[in-house]
Structures are given as C-alpha cells and as structure tokens.
Amino acid sequence: DEGACCVTQRALIGRILEHTMSQMRLNPLNGRWVTIVAERAQRPNDFAPRDSSVEDPSRPCPFCPGHEENTPPALETVEKDGTWSMRVIPNRYPAFDGEEAFAVHNLGPVFVMAEASGIHEVFVYTPDHHSGLHLLDDDHAGQLMRMLRDRFAEHAATPQVRYTQAIVNHGREAGASVAHPHGQILGLPFVPGEILDEE
C-alpha cells in the first residue's frame, strides 16, 4: 500500500537523519556529492561583521600558544625548542565524521543521500598568528610536508576513507572562521567526481 510505503520511507529518513550530524546528498543535476553540515553554521567567527576586515578582539585565538585548552587534544604535535611548531587536532565542527561504511540511501527520485562518515582534522602549521604558508622557511615547510604525509598514511589505513585532501583556507574570503594560519585535512568516504574525471 502506498501510504504504508511513505510512512516506512519517512521513518527511514528520520532514523538516518537522527544519527547523522552531517550528510551527503547526490546532486541530481550533475551527479556529484554535496556535503550538508548544519552545525558548521554555528562555528564561532574571529572576524568582525562582514563589512569589516578586522578581527574580533574580544575573542582570544584558540590556535595561539597558551590557548591549547580551547581546542580538542592534539592528534599529532611537532615540537621545536621546547614548544610546538605544528599541531593536528580534530575539527570541532567536522564535515566528515564517523566510521560507517559508505552506504547510499535512495529515498526518492531526487533524494539520494549517504552518511558523511570519514575524518576531518585541522592542522595549525605555525604558532605565529600573523604568519602564513608563504612565510615558512624551508625546514618548517619540509616538516609540514612530512606531517601531512604521516596524516595521509593514517587516513589510508582507515577503512571508511577512500580519498584524503589537505586544504589551506586563509582569511574570511577563503572560508576560514579563525584568522590564525591553519589548514584542514579531509578524509572522505568517496573519491570526488573532479578527481575521477582527471583519471
């Protein structure tokens, strides 16, 4: 009966969404996966209102030395001269999280979704709040590449991760919510269509 089918489908959707902080939906127009994470809209923002380019001075930077208690415990730390020079921490507002296997749910003609399981980490690649990737010396840049290599190897050993990507988004225009120089490492449960197109 069609009514019972709709009730069952709504119950399935409810169960999936109830346990999923983030989800992926298949764009029916281009066949590419899109990640939807409502919680990321609630991230604190270091920047003043959109019409200003200055930082909000009332909020201490969680990525600066001495504020480590404002972030989750480090997954990896590179030390230099008795203090850290780089840290990798879990993203407090992950787009990808969880150990579920990639499973597609066809919930309607244009509603195809999957849990956004995977790994989402932040790498703070300098303790200097006013530095940037382009200002790292050769030794520091080499350490950063080795640290990223190690994180990629760990992701590759994780069953639900099929593709890992590192990104650096510096400044509000690039989508960063914290002004301190940092990047993100995303362990995805699928290989993005753009990558498959290049093969």
Residues covered by each model-derived region:
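HIT superfamily nucleotide-processing domains
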Residues: 16-199
